[in-house]
Amino acid sequence: MAIVKMKPTSAGRRGMVRVVTEGLHKGAPYAPLLEKKNSTAGRNNNGHITTRHKGGGHKHHYRVVDFKRNKDGIPAKVERIEYDPNRTAFIALLCYADGERRYIIAPRGIQAGAVLVSGAEAAIKVGNTLPIRNIPVGTTIHCIEMKPGKGAQIARSAGASAVLLAKEGAYAQVRLRSGEVRKINVNCRATIGEVGNEEQSLKKIGKAGANRWRGIRPTVRGVVMNPVDHPHGGGEGRTGEAREPVSPWGTPAKGYRTRNNKRTDNMIVRRRYSNKG
């Protein structure tokens, strides 16, 4: 894929950068793999806002993506590459030799007509899924499981990947894009290559309305609120924050470490912020 800068024919298109979608399927998605997706607008079952700045936006169907890739030994042909409104990565529709169809995250470089295979005996080829114990050290991988059989949880967004650094006993060491080195069970599966649509990070939406289409509402700065609404609020005229940046509830907002999962601390060999002081 490539990017294109839009001509400044209006204020909204000035500075807009889009990803060229040539080669993507132009028709409707595969209906049997669609599910209804209800919008919560950031509210819980009591109607209370649990996530701010959400609401509105276009309605979407959820595309059921196969993150387990557990149909071993059966070759699957890539029928087409599709846009998925629910994620930054593109998805590929596979047709297995027995007639079943499944969506997967589309790896970089994959095209319609390619044949993919899952299982321990699969070749080391972009798009194939294998247990980590069968993948050579130094291979670039994505869609990595954290627990055997649970399905891919790591490196699923556009352009994401990880590198298999070492294997020792029951665990392998994987370096993520963030710099974090993590231990993964060698029976967990991973897909060869990296996720496609890597130009996604270069996209510029151009106008506020494009965020509203995505269900993202405006964010109001704390310094323009009243003291009752935010720790940064109040003052006569324009004032600064007068304290360290915090959330509306007083939690430090920039660089504050919030991880609190001691159960899995021993699985992290090197933290992602180890070079940040």
UniProtKB/Swiss-Prot annotation:
- Keyword Ribosomal protein annotated: yes
Database matches in SUPFAM superfamilies: Nucleic acid-binding proteins, Translation proteins SH3-like domain
GO BP terms: cytoplasmic translation
Q: Where is this region: Disordered?
A: 37-60, 223-265
InterPro entries per record:
NA-bd_OB-fold (IPR012340), Rib_uL2_dom2 (IPR014722), Ribosomal_uL2 (IPR002171), Ribosomal_uL2_bac/org-type (IPR005880), Ribosomal_uL2_C (IPR022669), Ribosomal_uL2_CS (IPR022671), Ribosomal_uL2_dom3 (IPR014726), Ribosomal_uL2_RNA-bd_dom (IPR022666)
Q: Which Pfam families match?
A: Ribosomal_L2, Ribosomal_L2_C
Q: One MF term from GO for this chain?
A: transferase activity
Q: Does the keyword DNA damage apply?
A: no
Biased-composition ranges, Basic and acidic residues, are: 229-244
Q: Which SMART domains match?
A: Ribosomal_L2, Ribosomal_L2_C
Q: Which NCBIfam families match?
A: rplB_bact
Record's subunit section:
Part of the 50S ribosomal subunit. Forms a bridge to the 30S subunit in the 70S ribosome.
Function of this protein?
One of the primary rRNA binding proteins. Required for association of the 30S and 50S subunits to form the 70S ribosome, for tRNA binding and peptide bond formation. It has been suggested to have peptidyltransferase activity; this is somewhat controversial. Makes several contacts with the 16S rRNA in the 70S ribosome.
Q: Which family does this protein fall into?
A: Belongs to the universal ribosomal protein uL2 family.
What protein name does the entry list?
A: Large ribosomal subunit protein uL2
- The species this protein was found in: Neisseria meningitidis serogroup C / serotype 2a (strain ATCC 700532 / DSM 15464 / FAM18)
